[in-house]
Amino acid sequence: MAIDGVKIIDSDQGYDIYNEVVGRYRDGDHVSNIIKDILDAEKDYCQTDFFTEIYWTALAYSLWKIGHLTDDIRDKTVELIQKGADPFWMEIDPKALKQRQKVLEKLAVQLQTENPRPLKVPKAKANTQ
C-alpha cells in the first residue's frame, strides 16, 4: 500500500474508502448500506494499529464530507485520535508522526461540527427520448 503523505486520504486505503463512500453516495446508494458494507470489511482493512487509524479516520472524514457522519463512528474515531498517531509514521519519515498528529487533531475538531457544505447527490436527469 502506498502512503503519499500524512493527510487523511493520502494512502491507497484512505483513498479507496473515500472513493467508495463518495462514489456510492453520488450514485444514489443509501448511506446505511454504504456504512454497513465498509464496517463489514473492517477486518480486511484493520490488519495493524496503523491501518486501523487510516481506516477509521478515512471513514469518518468521508461520512462527514457527505453530511452523514454517525455519532458512533465519530466517537470511535475521536477516541482513536486521542491515543495519538501510530508510531509507524516515524518509519515512513522522521517528521511524519508529528505532522500526522496535527492532521488528526484538526480532524477531531472537524468531526465535532456539522459539515456546512456536504456533497450533494446529483439529481437524475429526465430521459427526454
Roles of regions detected by a PLM:
Residues D29-D71:
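Amphipathic alpha-helical interaction modules
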Residues M1-D40:
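Short terminal alpha-helical segments
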Residues T77-Q129:
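Amphipathic alpha-helical binding modules
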Residues I3-V6, Y15, V22, E42, ...:
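Generic intrinsically disordered, low-complexity segments enriched for polar/acidic and small residues
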Residues D27-S32, R74-T77, I81:
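Short amphipathic alpha-helical heptad-repeat segments
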Residues Y25-D29, E42-Y45, I66, G84-F88, ...:
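Short, flexible helical or helix-coil boundary motifs
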Residues A2, D16-Y18, F51-W64, P94-L104:
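Amphipathic alpha-helical elements of HEAT/ARM-like alpha-solenoid repeat scaffolds that form extended
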Residues V6-Q13, G23-D27, L69, I73, ...:
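Non-membrane alpha-helical secondary structure
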